[in-house]
């Protein structure tokens, strides 16, 4: 019964820790994920929590039992013979000093083991996610060597902890046996002197074993405690991590917006980076307008739109929707009015319908199909074996890149956003499909008077936008319509010219 209750309690601790960790991870800002490896987070949620659970269960019970046994045996030995008891107990402080030094040495080693395990999980996660790329470039041997390298590091760290055990515990046993030797010598002299009988000496020596057993048990448990402590420190690094983007104490709900978007002197740098990605960006997009963002790689296009749903907070200036600073409203009320299709399309394991309805789980099948038609996804979905009930694999395996993008667009449209953000979301579809999607989006957005932000690499995608912003090194280098920029912007014409196909050679 004692074991059952201890295990039940430890499982409860692990359950609560996993829930607390997951809830915290869900609330942490994107800046935190930019600095962390996925494998390390997975290891903290699994292996580190399990180390804590193991000690919280059997370890705590054994520690309590050993402490009670140590206290009881000490009292008994003092009662039997005060002089012999003092001789026996003389080694106890030395043993605990050795154990304390052991804990101080082994703790950082266990932390290193967990860090190495996290790196191993990171390599594994990257390998599984990029298996097609690895095969395409015939890099299997390289990845195998990379995995073996981190696995060797993990093995080395584990062996180092084993060596620390082997180098420290013989001294603990030696000091413990010194106590036994002292009892035999001092007790033998008293037997010779007639102040102690042989039977009393044997009995005392027997009880001495009950003193050494809990001390050695505590010694072995100190290793489990050190490992649990190292894991707990890693777990609490997440639990104590500051949330970079969260609701202000006096945040208010954002009312339904017409979605006039204003950037007012916006400056931004990523946490830990001194380089400014956006430098004093200012512009205004009226309700129902389509704004297109163009620029070279690294010019700050994705960063700019990431500030709209407040994935990051500006480091200077302000972003406003209908005059409301996005930092002054609740995140839920803000993001519920924003639909976003990211450049990296993610689908979850489940049916096509579940993926489209991810933002609105209560949506009817008719609503799901309407969103799919608007995204030009309905035709290929109907051709799947089970239609909208077809189960797609993890990350949308089984669908082409263009099909995944169209499902992601349908998912964004279904939430009925006042502001739609398309981050290069049609890069994987052909020109004909892109034109059809754009036509549907234009009709939907203008009928409902919605505001759209489009990031695209192709000028053909954005030439009909009401406002085109050309970014260069975090600043707006040019702005206007397509016709205006063709007349006035050298950079825009360079981008346009780079996308024109050279005329075929005559012959």
Can you say where each PLM-predicted feature lies in the sequence?
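Helix-loop junctions and hydrophobic alpha-helical segments within the transmembrane domains
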Residues: 21, 25, 134, 235, ...
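Transmembrane-helix motif of ABC transporter permease domains
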Residues: 1-15, 23, 27, 34, ...
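Transmembrane helices of ABC transporter permease
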Residues: 58-112, 185-196
């Amino acid at each position: 019964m004692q074991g059952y209750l201890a295990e039940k309690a430890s499982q409860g601790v692990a359950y609560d820790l996993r829930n607390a960790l997951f809830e915290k991870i869900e609330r942490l800002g994107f800046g935190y994920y930019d600095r962390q490896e996925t494998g390390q987070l997975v290891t903290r949620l699994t292996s580190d929590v399990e180390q804590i659970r193991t000690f919280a269960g059997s370890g705590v019970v054994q520690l309590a039992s050993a402490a009670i046994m140590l206290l009881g045996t000490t009292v008994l030995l003092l009662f039997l013979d005060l002089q012999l008891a003092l001789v026996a107990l003389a080694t106890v402080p030395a043993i605990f000093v050795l154990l304390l030094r052991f804990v101080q040495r082994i703790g950082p080693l266990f932390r290193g083991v967990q860090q190495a395990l996290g790196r191993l999980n990171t390599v594994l996660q990257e390998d599984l996610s990029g298996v097609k790329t690895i095969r395409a470039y015939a890099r299997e041997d390289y990845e195998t060597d990379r995995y073996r390298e981190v696995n060797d590091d993990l093995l080395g760290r584990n062996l180092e902890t084993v060596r620390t055990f082997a180098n420290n515990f013989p001294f603990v046993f030696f000091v413990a046996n010194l106590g036994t030797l002292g009892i035999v010598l001092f007790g033998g002299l008293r037997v010779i002197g007639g102040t102690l009988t042989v039977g009393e000496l044997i009995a005392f020596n027997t009880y001495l074993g009950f003193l050494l057993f809990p001390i050695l048990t505590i010694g072995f448990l100190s290793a489990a405690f050190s490992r649990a402590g190292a894991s707990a420190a890693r777990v609490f690094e997440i639990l104590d991590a500051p949330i970079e983007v969260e609701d202000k104490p006096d945040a208010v709900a954002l009312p339904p917006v017409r979605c006039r978007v204003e950037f007012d002197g916006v400056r931004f740098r990523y946490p830990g980076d001194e380089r400014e990605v956006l430098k004093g960006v200012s512009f205004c997009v009226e309700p129902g307008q389509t704004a297109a963002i163009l620029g070279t790689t690294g010019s700050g296009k994705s960063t700019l739109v990431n500030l709209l749903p407040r994935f990051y907070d500006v480091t200077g200036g302000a972003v406003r929707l209908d005059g409301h600073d996005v930092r002054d409203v609740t995140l839920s009320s803000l993001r519920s009015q924003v639909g976003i299709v990211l450049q990296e399309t993610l689908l979850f394991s489940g049916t096509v319908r579940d993926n489209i309805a991810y933002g609105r789980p209560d949506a009817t099948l008719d609503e799901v199909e309407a969103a799919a038609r608007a995204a030009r996804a309905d035709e290929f979905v109907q051709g799947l074996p089970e239609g909208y009930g077809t189960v797609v694999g993890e990350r949308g395996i089984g669908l082409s890149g263009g099909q995944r993008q169209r499902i992601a667009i349908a998912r964004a449209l279904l939430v009925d956003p006042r502001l739609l953000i398309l981050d290069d979301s049609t890069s994987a579809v052909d020109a004909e499909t892109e034109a059809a999607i754009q036509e549907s989006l234009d009709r939907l957005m203008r009928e409902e008077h919605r505001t759209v932000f489009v990031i695209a690499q192709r000028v053909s995608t954005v030439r009909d936008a009401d406002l085109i912003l050309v970014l260069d090194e975090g600043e707006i280098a040019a702005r206007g319509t397509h016709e205006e920029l063709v007349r006035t912007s050298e950079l825009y014409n360079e981008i346009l010219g780079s996308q024109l196909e050279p005329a075929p050679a005559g012959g």
